[in-house]
Amino acid sequence: MKCPFCGAEDTAVADTRLNDEADVVRRRRKCNACDKRFTTYERAEIQLPQVVKKNGLRTEFSRAKLRASLELALRKRPVSIESVDAAVADIEERLLSAGEREVTTQQLGELVMRELKKLDKVAYIRFASVYRNFEDVDAFSRAIREVSPAAKKK
């Protein structure tokens, strides 16, 4: 590890600690050239799949885009930031556990809809109306029946 103060590559680890979640390692280091101390944080690099768009283009998975999609559907709805964070983490975990190198935007959309259905039915309908390209009232009615407990009992 290069010293950020003098640029020397001769450094030693003085202390190592795991954070509470055990996903980050904090290391206190000491430069053997200038005797200054500094802290580094280490995290395992997670490789999320490439996103294949409808037109065939491939892009990097974007946590920010995923979060923005959820937040847009949940705008002005009584859902906590923590719940949104958990939904994003759940979607990422599903993508990682699938072990695929690529995921289609359709697959991502279905994962988002699954999370929104659990979080807020109105947000689910909002997202579904755009994602599934609802063109008439019947499409909305079908989606509402899908999430309405009263409609399922009949």
Curated annotation (Swiss-Prot):
Belongs to the NrdR family. Binds 1 zinc ion. A zinc finger (unnamed) spans 3-34. Pfam families: ATP-cone, Zn_ribbon_NrdR. GO terms for biological process: negative regulation of DNA-templated transcription. GO terms for molecular function: ATP binding; DNA binding; zinc ion binding. Its cofactor is Zn(2+). This is Transcriptional repressor NrdR. Negatively regulates transcription of bacterial ribonucleotide reductase nrd genes and operons by binding to NrdR-boxes. Keywords: ATP-binding, DNA-binding, Metal-binding, Nucleotide-binding, Repressor, Transcription, Transcription regulation, Zinc, Zinc-finger. The lineage of its organism: Bacteria, Pseudomonadati, Pseudomonadota, Betaproteobacteria, Rhodocyclales. It comes from the Bacteria. InterPro entries: ATP-cone_dom, NrdR-like_N, RNR_NrdR-like. Residues 49-139 form the ATP-cone domain.
